[in-house]
């Protein structure tokens, strides 16, 4: 049974080079409209990315990241608890903290201890992501083998969570993202192995998990389709993740995911009711 308590992150990219064209919103008015629509159709949180992080992404300065997110934060000032900023730039992260966002999402997993005092003083939640690269954006050179992946991810999170906790960050603010696609390996088998073993990861780590598989490279490699046609495979992977312990899912299609969760819950209720009725019939 899928769970309504799953938190859905809708992906909003304020970029011109994100790998999925339909997620790009560079003009401020279009970004605001897209964010409001995401919240309307099923996003609990809008995850705002001012820079792409795929292997071919162009670098964006912290000043440009801040310039891109500022108008959106102005427009959503009364819903900041539903805004996540997806950036690994400390300057951008500090700006987001000052604006009072609900979440910071760092693909490097918050590696800079100099930022920890600012994080500890805030109350936002932190999406701490694992990547084989350890720093920077995804690359095609990280080759984490399937058989090594779970142990490597657990070791990374044990060390990073310990560092954050020692700096005064409460455990209930931490959300762990094992990374997917190129963040693990160009080989789809590594991501498939991690996705198949989410319950093991969750048991080992004891903290909420966020899974971000939407339109990732390993899905395309598995089903033989381009990014634009990976909506169904993405939804299937997301539902699998939720059914196997994911507490948060980051997606390009929050409305579709929310509808699928709602239908699954309704079906489960009918199944439970029918089972009870059969029990009464045989009493």
UniProtKB/Swiss-Prot annotation:
Its cofactor is Mg(2+). Belongs to the DHPS family. Its EC number is 2.5.1.15. The gene is sulI. (7,8-dihydropterin-6-yl)methyl diphosphate binds at residues 86, 105, 177, 216, 250-252. Residues 6-262 form the Pterin-binding domain. One of its GO terms (biological process) is folic acid biosynthetic process. Mg(2+) binds at residue 13. It catalyses: (7,8-dihydropterin-6-yl)methyl diphosphate + 4-aminobenzoate = 7,8-dihydropteroate + diphosphate. Catalyzes the condensation of para-aminobenzoate (pABA) with 6-hydroxymethyl-7,8-dihydropterin diphosphate (DHPt-PP) to form 7,8-dihydropteroate (H2Pte), the immediate precursor of folate derivatives. Implicated in resistance to sulfonamide. The sulI gene is located on various large self-transmissible resistance plasmids and on transposons related to Tn21. One of its GO terms (cellular component) is cytosol. Homodimer or homotrimer. This is Dihydropteroate synthase type-1. InterPro entries: DHP_synth-like, DHP_synth_dom, Dihydropteroate_synth-like_sf, Pterin-binding_dom. Keywords: Antibiotic resistance, Folate biosynthesis, Magnesium, Metal-binding, Transferase, Transposable element. Pathway: Cofactor biosynthesis; tetrahydrofolate biosynthesis; 7,8-dihydrofolate from 2-amino-4-hydroxy-6-hydroxymethyl-7,8-dihydropteridine diphosphate and 4-aminobenzoate: step 1/2. GO terms for molecular function: dihydropteroate synthase activity; metal ion binding.
